[in-house]
């Protein structure tokens, strides 16, 4: 029986563990946090005690279901999304989302989904090393040195090592040190974010089946996203620059009060006061893109998820691509009958292209959402109208393909570019 060591037991690592265990691998998962089935405190935001809401689109949903997790249990971790709302001048412009298949995106409770993955990993016989950190990775020896709360180091020997340990991956750092010509790029956005949580989303006018976006009328100052989370609260991510005023470093109460009054004026005064209180009290979080020149080392070590391609959340695809990574990886193992020397290089070949395309689109979406652009809404309607009239000539709505299909990201990027060309032609005409 082959032994797989997975460093990182989050969403990507957990799903990969289930896939491999069901294929007969002996799976060992090293996770620095505690067991979410016993205590979720280390899996949620330390300050707000709530996880940031995330959106699971069709590619993520299909990847989870392919691992044998029942759809009903996955659906119980979130709410189906039927529309997006864009706030401009205090008014919402709604955009209905029409599914192309029998799936709708889910506004997901990350902590509940994590518990679901751990439940099925346990049922599949996965062994976890909770509250253990990875100290060292032997790339050629296929072993990892770990340390638990007792301070005693322990070496785990395997037949493969999977790095699913996030944007600051210890496995990727070992590859950086051990591989010649390994290229790594970490790009910080000029914005960061803080997550604010308000109780009783329904009373505040937020629908649980809708994603809300802010900042379209801010002239590039900020971007925001809000979604109802399963406990009935609304989670609002406020993205601001680190410099200037207002910014994430602003501590002047009148300045930030004016900001919330300007862009969230539709909320009651007590809600805006609570947003102000949380904003001034909470630390900020960075937004980064991580790119690696390769996702593997020989047939020994593989990176997936954020360890390979951490992405700022402006396309809503970071988690979805990570889950698709897990599915793609095991499908390659199946295709090559477990031959890691063939499957690992092909994984890099296939997924590197997709990761780069996804990150480029996320950056482009960030620029759109944080810039004043009233044409944005007309363009979306124009695209749908033109495709309905000339389906063989005019490309479909890229957003619908993104949310409702598993179309490869490089193909979606081509659609986006074609739309740009045709839209410019349409404007000239």
Swiss-Prot record:
Violacein production is used as a biosensor for the detection of quorum-sensing AHL production. Violacein possesses antibacterial, antiviral, antimicrobial, antileishmanial, trypanocidal and potential antitumoral activities. Its cofactor is FAD. The lineage of its organism: Bacteria, Pseudomonadati, Pseudomonadota, Betaproteobacteria, Neisseriales. The gene is vioC. GO terms for molecular function: FAD binding; kynurenine 3-monooxygenase activity. Its EC number is 1.14.13.224. Pathway: Pigment biosynthesis; violacein biosynthesis. The keyword NADP applies. It comes from Chromobacterium violaceum (strain ATCC 12472 / DSM 30191 / JCM 1249 / CCUG 213 / NBRC 12614 / NCIMB 9131 / NCTC 9757 / MK). Catalyzes the hydroxylation of the 16-position of protoviolaceinate and protodeoxyviolaceinate to form violacein and deoxyviolacein, respectively. It catalyses: protoviolaceinate + NADPH + O2 + H(+) = violaceinate + NADP(+) + H2O; protoviolaceinate + NADH + O2 + H(+) = violaceinate + NAD(+) + H2O; protodeoxyviolaceinate + NADPH + O2 + H(+) = deoxyviolaceinate + NADP(+) + H2O; protodeoxyviolaceinate + NADH + O2 + H(+) = deoxyviolaceinate + NAD(+) + H2O. The keyword NAD applies. Induction: By N-acylhomoserine lactone (AHL). This is Violacein synthase. One of its GO terms (biological process) is kynurenine metabolic process. InterPro entries: AB_hydrolase_fold, FAD-bd, FAD/NAD-bd_sf. Keywords: Antibiotic biosynthesis, FAD, Flavoprotein, Monooxygenase, NAD, NADP, Oxidoreductase. Disulfide bonds: none annotated. FAD binds at residues 3-21.
